[in-house]
């Protein structure tokens, strides 16, 4: 039997997709042998799929102010932010509110 996978969906909108190769939706199969929190996911994203200007998406170990994060349509602030443990089929949406003038 193969390695267990944790399947989740990442979505990017309102300009956040521009930092990720202009891809608005990604289905991921993460290593199911480890515990995946949003903090771990952000590190993975930075290392693997963040293609443009990471300073516009990340600030330290978290998303920068102006990036909204919704997990299954719920504000991540209500779910524990970086400590939230990802579950199978979670949908994580990143929305940029940062727009030039």
UniProtKB/Swiss-Prot annotation:
The record's section on Gene3D superfamilies has:
3.10.20.30
Subcellular location per the Swiss-Prot or TrEMBL entry: Cytoplasm
Pathway listed for it is: tRNA modification; 5-methoxycarbonylmethyl-2-thiouridine-tRNA biosynthesis
Cross-link Glycyl lysine isopeptide (Gly-Lys) (interchain with K-? in acceptor proteins) placement: 101
Q: Which domain of life is it from?
A: Eukaryota
On whether tRNA processing is a keyword of this UniProt record, the answer is yes
What does the UniProt PTM comment say about this protein?
C-terminal thiocarboxylation occurs in 2 steps, it is first acyl-adenylated (-COAMP) via the hesA/moeB/thiF part of the MOCS3 homolog, then thiocarboxylated (-COSH) via the rhodanese domain of the MOCS3 homolog.
Q: Do you know which InterPro entries this protein is assigned to?
A: Beta-grasp_dom_sf, Mopterin_synth/thiamin_S_b, Urm1
Which coarse location class describes where this protein primarily resides?
Answer: cytoplasm
Carrying 1-thioglycine, the residues are 101
The family annotation for this protein states: Belongs to the URM1 family.
Known partners and oligomeric status: Interacts with cer.
Q: Explain the purpose of this protein.
A: Acts as a sulfur carrier required for 2-thiolation of mcm(5)S(2)U at tRNA wobble positions of cytosolic tRNA(Lys), tRNA(Glu) and tRNA(Gln). Serves as sulfur donor in tRNA 2-thiolation reaction by being thiocarboxylated (-COSH) at its C-terminus by MOCS3. The sulfur is then transferred to tRNA to form 2-thiolation of mcm(5)S(2)U. Also acts as a ubiquitin-like protein (UBL) that is covalently conjugated via an isopeptide bond to lysine residues of target proteins such as Prx2/Jafrac1, Ciao1, Eip71CD and GILT1.
Q: Which HAMAP family match?
A: Urm1
**PANTHER family, from UniProt?**
RURM1 PROTEIN
Q: What is this protein called?
A: Ubiquitin-related modifier 1 homolog
Organism expressing this protein natively: Drosophila erecta
């Amino acid at each position: 039997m193969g390695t267990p996978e944790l399947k989740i969906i990442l979505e990017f909108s309102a300009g956040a997709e521009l930092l990720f190769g202009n891809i608005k939706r990604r289905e991921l199969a993460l290593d199911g042998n480890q515990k995946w929190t949003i903090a771990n996911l952000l590190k993975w994203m930075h290392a693997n799929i963040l293609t443009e200007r990471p300073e516009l998406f990340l600030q330290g170990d978290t998303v920068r102010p102006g990036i909204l994060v919704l997990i299954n349509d719920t504000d991540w602030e209500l779910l524990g932010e970086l400590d939230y443990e990802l579950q199978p089929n979670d949908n994580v949406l990143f929305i940029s509110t940062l727009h030039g003038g």
